[in-house]
């Protein structure tokens, strides 16, 4: 079989111009922009429609560990800090940092493992604008009315919360539901309970969720090390 055509002794494919990282990041940001804008403009009607659409299971009954494995195929097209690294690697980055800092309590390990499970919607054809991005309350809810009494933009947080509530402690379910909440802009509508959970849970977790993201840090600890944690918390398949 004839090999690839060579010009001047070089494979012609190697002569194709390569983007610098700066150019690649600029293209990434350009592609992310419209997604972020669509999410920013998400209306009350759109949120209600998404809630109705996803009131039923999408994948049927599935083991939570399998969902975590599927995160290996999920790429957030708007996350410039991860820059194409999978959500499963992101989970491992969080866990590695917690272990290093001595903050890997059983509760924080569990929420790190499951907080982004809703991003499997990226594999179903759903518009990424309805899956990723940060959230804020929609409209002008009274100050201190409580997050549960507000309409918040819809994304993977709410999808996963609806599947996990009742299966994990209430505090952790709350954290899954609101881990993408923009702070401090969303604090105005929080009630006393929300504010307490924000200080105790959301702020510490957000530190790891955001600060550990990198396309260059690939933790050596295998995810399999945490399988027993997942199987103990979810001994049976769940509707997802």
Predicted regions and their residues:
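Histidine-centered, transition-metal-coordinating active-site segments
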Residues: 2-13, 168-171, 183, 216-240
């Amino acid at each position: 079989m004839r090999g690839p055509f060579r010009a001047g002794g070089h494979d012609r494919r190697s002569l194709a111009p390569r983007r610098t990282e700066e150019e690649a990041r600029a293209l990434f940001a350009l592609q992310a922009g419209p997604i972020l804008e669509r999410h920013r403009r998400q209306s009350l009607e759109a949120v209600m429609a998404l809630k109705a659409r996803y009131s039923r299971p999408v994948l049927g009954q599935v083991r939570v560990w399998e969902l975590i494995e599927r995160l290996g195929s999920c790429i957030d097209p708007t996350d410039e800090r991860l820059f194409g690294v999978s959500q499963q690697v992101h989970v491992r980055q969080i866990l590695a940092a917690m272990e290093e800092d001595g903050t890997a309590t059983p509760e924080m390990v569990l929420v790190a493992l499951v907080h982004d499970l809703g991003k499997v919607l990226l594999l179903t054809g759903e518009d990424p604008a309805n899956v990723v991005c940060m959230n804020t309350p929609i409209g002008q809810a009274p100050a201190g009315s409580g997050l549960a009494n507000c309409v918040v933009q819809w994304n993977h947080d709410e999808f996963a919360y609806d599947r996990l509530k009742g299966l994990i402690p209430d505090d952790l379910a709350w954290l899954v539901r609101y881990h993408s909440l923009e702070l401090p802009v969303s604090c105005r509508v929080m009630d006393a309970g929300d504010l307490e959970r924000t200080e105790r849970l959301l702020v510490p977790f957000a530190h790891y969720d955001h600060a550990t993201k990198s396309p260059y840090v690939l933790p050596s600890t295998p995810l399999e090390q945490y399988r027993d944690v997942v199987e103990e918390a979810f001994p049976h398949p769940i509707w997802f």
